[in-house]
């Protein structure tokens, strides 16, 4: 699971140098004489967050490249306010064998949770069996392609753990909501890891907003 910055809004207004400054600039649309006031921008952003004036955070945009599994990608794609481009198994061959994933016990008190208490012997068994299955799956997939079977047909035998790449684009308001939701309890562990990788990039690009959100 990883995330990488692809693009972030670059203002062309003189005196407005970052996407974060642009959000503050847009927030002052009704006060044009004071729009370019970067000294008080962080305080304004904090005020807007405290009072839930979220619309200003729709004036800047960020795109990240996410490396994850098809299983987690299905959860990511449910965030419909975003715009996505995903690696197509229909048009491109899958070259990478999935890595084994951690085993966790089902939490019977909370079905959204899993418990990291699986014994080491069972973890080893689980990893070994996954490696066997993934090797068989990739062998069958590649054999199908060699026989001329279309990628769109051969892909159906690939497991949900198959790696994929997604470009995820959204407003800063979208990213705040996504990160808040997917780093919280009730999210699958692997998705939390991915959302935290996104959060690290967000903090670097939008330090004042991140501070106002108590992320740092």
Swiss-Prot record:
* This protein's pathway: Pyrimidine metabolism; dTTP biosynthesis
- NADP found in the keyword field: yes
Which coenzymes or cofactors are required? FAD
Write out the GO biological process terms. dTMP biosynthetic process; dTTP biosynthetic process; methylation
InterPro entries per record? Thymidylate_synthase_ThyX (IPR003669), Thymidylate_synthase_ThyX_sf (IPR036098)
GO molecular function: any one?
A: flavin adenine dinucleotide binding
Free-text remark on how the cofactor is bound: Binds 4 FAD per tetramer. Each FAD binding site is formed by three monomers.
Q: Where does dUMP bind?
A: 75-78, 86-90, 155, 182
What is the top EC class of this enzyme, as a single word? Answer: transferase
Question: What residue intervals hold the motif ThyX motif?
Answer: 78-88
Name the Enzyme Commission number(s) assigned to this protein: 2.1.1.148
Which residues are named in the active-site annotation? 182
On whether Chloroplast is a keyword of this UniProt record, the answer is no
List the keywords (alphabetical): FAD, Flavoprotein, Methyltransferase, NADP, Nucleotide biosynthesis, Transferase
The subunit structure is: Homotetramer.
Protein family (similarity comment) = Belongs to the thymidylate synthase ThyX family.
Q: What is this protein called?
A: Probable flavin-dependent thymidylate synthase
Organism source for this protein? Paramecium bursaria Chlorella virus 1 (PBCV-1)
């Amino acid at each position: 699971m990883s995330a990488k910055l692809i693009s972030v809004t670059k203002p062309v207004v003189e005196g407005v140098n970052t996407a974060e400054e642009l959000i503050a600039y847009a927030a002052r649309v009704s006060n044009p004489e004071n729009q370019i006031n970067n000294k008080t921008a962080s305080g304004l952003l904090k005020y807007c967050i405290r009072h839930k004036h979220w619309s200003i955070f729709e004036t800047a945009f960020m795109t990240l490249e996410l490396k994850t599994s098809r299983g987690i990608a299905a959860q990511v794609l449910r965030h419909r306010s975003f715009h996505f481009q995903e690696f197509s198994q229909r048009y491109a061959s899958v070259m990478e064998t999935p890595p084994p994933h951690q085993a966790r016990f089902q939490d019977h008190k909370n079905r959204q949770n899993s418990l990291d208490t699986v014994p080491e012997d069972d973890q080893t068994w689980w990893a070994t069996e996954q490696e066997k299955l993934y090797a068989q799956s990739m062998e069958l997939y590649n054999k199908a392609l060699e026989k001329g079977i279309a990628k769109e047909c051969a892909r159906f035998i690939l497991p949900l753990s198959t790696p994929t790449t997604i470009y995820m684009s959204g407003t800063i308001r979208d990213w705040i909501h996504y990160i808040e939701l997917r780093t919280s309890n009730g999210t699958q562990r692997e998705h939390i890891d991915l959302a935290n990788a996104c959060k690290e990039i967000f903090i670097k690009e939008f330090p004042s907003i991140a501070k106002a959100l108590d992320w740092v």
